[in-house]
Every structure is written in C-alpha cells, then in structure tokens.
Amino acid sequence: MKLQVSNTNAPTWRDLTVTSDLPSKLKHLEELAKNLWWVWNSEGKSLFRDLNPDLWRSSGENPVILLQQLSSERMDEIMADKAMMDRIDHVYDMFKQYMAKPMRKDIPSVSYFSMEYGLCNALKIYSGGLGVLAGDYIKEASDSCVPMTAVGFLYRFGYFTQSLSVDGQQIANYEPQNFNQLPIEQVMEENGRPMILEVPYPGRTIYSHVWRVNVGRMKLYLMDTDFDMNSEFDRVITHQLYGGDWENRIKQE
C-alpha cells in the first residue's frame, strides 16, 4: 500500500505496511519470532506453522510476517483454544529455560566473520553451503554455550527469481527485502538514534547501520550501508551477496 503525503507541492510517496497488533495473551509469540531458536527446535517451528498453515507457507515460513498478517478472528480462535494456549506457554517455557543456561567462562570468546549466514529461508543473506556452514556454527555455539559474536552483512536484495525475456534470455529479478518483516532488530544508541559505524576508506568514510539477529544465545550483527549518508556507489556495498564488480567485492571484504 502507498500513502500519499499532500502537504507539499509535489506528492511524496511512502510505504505503509498494515499489520496486526498482538493481544497481550499472545505477546510471547512475538518474542519467539524475534529469536531464531525456533529454526532448529521442532516444537517451536510446528507451533508457528499450526497458527495458520496457509499463511505460514505463503509467508515463506517467516514468523514475523505470519504474526503481522494474522487476522483478529484467528487470534480470537487461538486465545479460546486452551490446548493451543497451553502449547504456546510450553514452547515459551522451553525457550526461557534454554536462554537461562549460563555461557561458558572457561574458554575465550570467539569473533566470527562471514560474508553469508544460512539460518532460515526468511533471512536471505546466504547463497549455499558456505552460508549454511556458518549458520550451523552459530547454532552449535548457542547450544554449547560458547561465547561467540558473529558479524556479516544485511543484504538489501535477497535471492533472485528468474524469468525469460521475449527473445528467450534468462533475466534475474531481484526483490528488495523489507527489513520490517525480518526477524532482526536495528541496534540503537542510548539517545534512541540508530547506531552508525564509520569505516575509513581511501578518500572518504563509509557509514554503516547495524542490525542484530538473535540466534538462540548468540548475537549476529549485520552491517547495512544502504542509506543516504553514503554515496550511491557505497550504498550498493550491501545490496547483493557477491554482487557487483570487483571493486564492490573488495569493499565488502
């Protein structure tokens, strides 16, 4: 949906996303959706699926979109279903017990850097085996209580879909990810403004927003250069995984 702001001579168009507000009885679902623990917990994943199987499939198994688009009628049905509410409480209790386990202090902390992380289909920041392996490292660190902090990129454009041109040529179509519909949180300063990293580069400074992904007990921080403090040449650094020319690849690395 587009929202027109008409207080200027020329119309300004802004994106407007219509979402559902969760009742207080269902707020635990929101916390579960914002931590990828459910990805490798079968009861957590099946809980989201059973809230609305059709919407779960159409959302690409994205619990954030699922909860945003869950109808008020369906919410009422869930809250009236004692078995479902007990199930939500059970999964949430499992999650809290998992998160309460202390981190190991007998080993050094680990900083892990990767261009891609394969964690779930909803977060399109990986391409193949390397990303899946990196994602598995984080999950295993979480299960083992190993103190790890992971760093990567939040790519504006995720996977591409292919189509054919009129002359039979394959065309790669990239659709931008809507960060408001992803299981991520923007890192903010104490004053409430977005945190901005400054990265020195020959002749200029590149600026980066930071987004946090909760992966069980682990934190994955993703950098994003696609905002107006950067030039158009630097905004594309985090547009695509392994995308662009060699200079852009060097910038990413």
Question: Model-found features: residue ranges?
Answer:
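Catalytic cores of carbohydrate-active enzymes across secretory and cytosolic contexts
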Residues: 1-253
